[in-house]
Amino acid sequence: MSVPLDDLGEAHGFDVIVDEVSSLDAKAKSVILKSGATLEGFDKIIIAMGHHKVQIKGMKEHTLSICGAPEEAVELHTRLDALIQKGGGKLAFGFGGNPKDRSSVRGGPAFEVMFNVHNYLKKRKLRDKFELTFFAPMQRPGEKMEEKAHVMMDKMLGMTNIDKKIGKKIVSFESDGIIFEDGEKLVSDLTMFISAGKGHNILESSKLPLSEAGYVVTNEYNEVEGFEGIYAIGDSAMLLGENDWKAKQGHVAEVMARNVAHNILNPDDKLSYIDHLNILCVMDIGNGAAFVYRSNTSAKMIPLPIIGHWMKKGWGWYCKNSKLGRIPRLPGL
């Protein structure tokens, strides 16, 4: 699913400038672009630049991600098809961590790709020609989803004959595999890896208050205190809250964006994003899905055979068309 920015701008009445930010001076409310243009004179600036990835030696050269440039996802498909033409191979799927901010881990998409590839190969009657391995540096990957979900995920790995290598720090990536801190090498013909996030590099010189992981520190209204008219949302902002399961997800970013728009227009009736902090996703596995939800008061993982896959595809259609104003948004979404 993709939404052209020009179409989005036309639907909602804002101008689109396609350029790269070279620097941001929050005090001066000045943004310098790679083209040399300067954006200044604005009363409000909302920082929604996403984040950068924690770098590991060889990651750029020897891995592909579905949480990066769109071209990487296309290349992943191309290289998988090449291995199919070759007759088989060893595939590795994993994600990384950031001990400075656990909310920046992207685990769900890695599981989705892995299980979808498993079912793709199974449909083509080639699953026995491939070795699939899941890897991650933490001892209990997926535990944010809560204990029962973690156990269910482990069972799914066993049922689909997917090996795992967990609990060991990733030292480097090579053209033919992954090296771990204990010296062991996981051999791989194709490695899909989603690195954990860290604050965007541009923010380092912005003079804004940053967390240890480099994210902008805001209050619950996404205001940067001490910087009037500056807001940070989504992956650019540090998530507040003491719970260790919180995660940076798209629906939380949307709540932040909606709240900031409301708060700018209604300064005496501000909305907080704190009560909306939860984990919510439909994890597509190719022949079905799993509904995952966790909050301070509830945690569940519900299998959705067959229908779950189509629910996920349907959500993509709804998401695109509702954002373009072609259909109404569902209440609360």
Provide a role label for each language-model segment:
Residues 62-87, 185-190, 194-255:
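FAD-site-proximal beta/loop scaffold in flavoenzymes
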Residues 13-112, 116-125, 192:
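FAD-binding core/adjacent interface of flavoenzyme oxidoreductases
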Residues 45, 148-221:
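A cross-taxonomic marker for long C-terminal extensions/tails that follow the last structured domain
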Residues 17-20, 25-26, 136, 164-168, ...:
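Short loop/edge segments at beta-strand edges and connector loops
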Residues 259-333:
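C-terminal, flexible cofactor-proximal segment of oxidoreductases
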Residues 105-107, 233-285:
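A conserved FAD-binding loop/helix module that cradles the flavin
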Residues 1, 102-168:
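Rossmann-like dinucleotide-binding cores of NAD(P)H-dependent redox enzymes
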Residues 1-42, 145-163:
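N-terminal Rossmann-like dinucleotide/flavin-binding domain of flavoprotein oxidoreductases
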